[in-house]
């Protein structure tokens, strides 16, 4: 792969539109896995995805020009999967399995285009919604977040001259490489790139991926970014997301259906995928509630991805549950991916080494850590906590409780109903990093 001079490219930025999203594969792999299942099992469900800025102090609409945002969103609307991309999806092996994508789904994907968006401004924030069929609207989440994150980076970089840009990227590369050198000291560690949605830029994410390939070799297991996986001959990695139980729960018609919703999702998933893709995401309505009611067969799955509790605390709770179910944790897998930095990775690795198989999905701290790199302080270079979540399904409000109340999403009355139903046990408020 060619290694462009990122600073020069930023400085020579004179064209009318430099597309941030150049391919529909510039997304997380689990989106394609989920969308195939959604397309097959829930073709008539309509949803709304909404942008949510959890960093309330940042007035996003003041940082990003609306016309530039619309231009980037409009460009994404024009994209289609290319013949080369379709051949790769059809012929590549994912998670050791050929033809993971069914021919009928690939035929549907050939004609896929993103649905229209709704954009407005209010009190310094952007109000951005995506409506439509679940299979279509879901595909907006990652490109929308990547567009906004990179536009904010570009706005910050406009304040720097060519020399300052050289300094910025030289420092950022050195900072990144120091992290790589620390990770090299952890034997048998498994690290993957989960940094697409809040990246500084596509080019920077690509450089970080190349740095990990060079620096830690086989310990770098792959990337969630499908386009980068294709272009760099890496494994495309990903499991499933909170949107699945959020939507199924929103569609429930009674308490019994609501209680079964998180496990119905797993049964659906098992119809399509197996092996290392059998990873449980337990915290949508609180991990404690999930484990309390989980059927015994859930313990037979490959592993868990504890997402919103502190990694050591969350991992220990799952290990305890496995033992209660007669499972050997040393044969199970924990995937840690929530707001990881190198300090957290090191601490978690040392705590669990020899107790359980581990993998780390490294996100924003990998692809958007420019703090202290600019010759002068530029606050808009700092990453912010931005999400794009499903908020309605067939007109009904969708809810995410999480193990951290600060990450709760949904209409306040509906959130309270879910809390009354699932309980509030072991949910502890903590500052949200990313």
From Swiss-Prot:
Domain of life according to the entry: Bacteria
Name this protein carries in UniProt: Nicotinate phosphoribosyltransferase
GO CC list: cytosol
EC number: 6.3.4.21
Biological processes per GO annotation: NAD biosynthetic process via the salvage pathway
Coiled-coil residue windows: none
Gene from which the chain derives: pncB
Secreted in keyword set: no
Pathway note: Cofactor biosynthesis; NAD(+) biosynthesis; nicotinate D-ribonucleotide from nicotinate: step 1/1
Pfam (any one): NAPRTase_N
Catalytic activity, reaction form: nicotinate + 5-phospho-alpha-D-ribose 1-diphosphate + ATP + H2O = nicotinate beta-D-ribonucleotide + ADP + phosphate + diphosphate
Similarity comment: family membership: Belongs to the NAPRTase family.
Phosphohistidine modification, residue list: 242
Organism name: Bartonella tribocorum (strain CIP 105476 / IBS 506)
Keywords, ordered alphabetically: Ligase, Phosphoprotein, Pyridine nucleotide biosynthesis
Alphabetical list of HAMAP family matching this protein: NAPRTase
General function of this protein: Catalyzes the synthesis of beta-nicotinate D-ribonucleotide from nicotinate and 5-phospho-D-ribose 1-phosphate at the expense of ATP.
Any one GO molecular-function label of the UniProt entry: nicotinate phosphoribosyltransferase activity
Post-translational modification: Transiently phosphorylated on a His residue during the reaction cycle. Phosphorylation strongly increases the affinity for substrates and increases the rate of nicotinate D-ribonucleotide production. Dephosphorylation regenerates the low-affinity form of the enzyme, leading to product release.
SUPFAM superfamilies hit by this protein: Nicotinate/Quinolinate PRTase C-terminal domain-like (SSF51690), Nicotinate/Quinolinate PRTase N-terminal domain-like (SSF54675)
Keyword Phosphoprotein: yes
């Amino acid at each position: 792969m060619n290694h462009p001079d990122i600073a020069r490219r930023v400085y020579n930025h004179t064209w009318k539109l430099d597309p941030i999203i150049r391919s529909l594969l510039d997304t997380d792999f689990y989106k394609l896995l989920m969308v195939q299942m959604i397309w097959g099992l829930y073709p008539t469900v309509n949803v709304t995805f909404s942008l949510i800025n959890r960093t309330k102090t940042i007035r996003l609409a003041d940082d990003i020009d609306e016309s530039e945002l619309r231009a980037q969103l409009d460009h994404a609307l024009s994209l289609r999967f290319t013949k080369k991309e379709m051949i790769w999806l059809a012929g590549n092996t994912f998670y050791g399995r050929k033809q993971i994508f069914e021919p009928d789904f690939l035929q549907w994907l050939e004609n896929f285009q993103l649905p229209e968006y709704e954009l407005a401004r209010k009190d310094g924030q952007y109000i951005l919604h995506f409506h439509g069929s679940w299979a279509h609207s879901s595909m907006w989440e990652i490109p929308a977040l990547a567009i906004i994150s990179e536009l904010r980076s570009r706005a910050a970089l406009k304040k720097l001259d060519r020399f300052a840009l050289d300094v910025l990227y030289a420092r950022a590369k050195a900072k990144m490489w120091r992290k790589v050198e620390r990770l090299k000291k952890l034997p048998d560690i498994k690290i993957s790139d989960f940094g697409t949605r809040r990246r500084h830029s596509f080019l920077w994410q690509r450089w970080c991926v190349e740095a990990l390939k060079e620096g830690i070799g086989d310990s770098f297991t792959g990337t969630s970014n499908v386009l980068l996986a294709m272009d760099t001959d890496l494994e495309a990695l990903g499991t499933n997301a909170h949107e699945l139980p959020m939507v199924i729960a929103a569609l429930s018609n009674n308490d019994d259906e609501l209680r079964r919703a998180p496990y119905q999702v797993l049964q659906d998933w098992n119809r399509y995928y197996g092996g290392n893709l059998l990873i449980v995401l337990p915290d949508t309505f609180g991990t404690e509630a999930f484990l309390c009611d989980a059927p015994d067969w859930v313990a037979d799955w490959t592993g868990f991805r504890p997402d919103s509790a502190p990694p050591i605390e969350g991992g220990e709770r799952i290990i305890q549950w496995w033992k209660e179910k007669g499972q050997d944790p040393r044969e199970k897998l924990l995937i840690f991916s929530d707001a990881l930095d190198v300090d957290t990775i090191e601490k978690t690795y040392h705590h669990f080494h020899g107790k359980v198989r581990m993998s780390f999905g490294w996100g924003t701290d990998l692809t958007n850590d420019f703090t202290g790199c600019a010759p002068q302080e530029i606050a808009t270079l700092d990453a912010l906590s931005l999400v794009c979540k499903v908020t309605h399904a067939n007109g009904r409000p969708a809810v995410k409780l999480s193990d951290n109340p600060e990450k709760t999403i949904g209409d306040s009355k509906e959130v309270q109903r879910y809390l009354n139903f699932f309980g509030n046990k072991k949910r502890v408020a903590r500052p949200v990093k990313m």
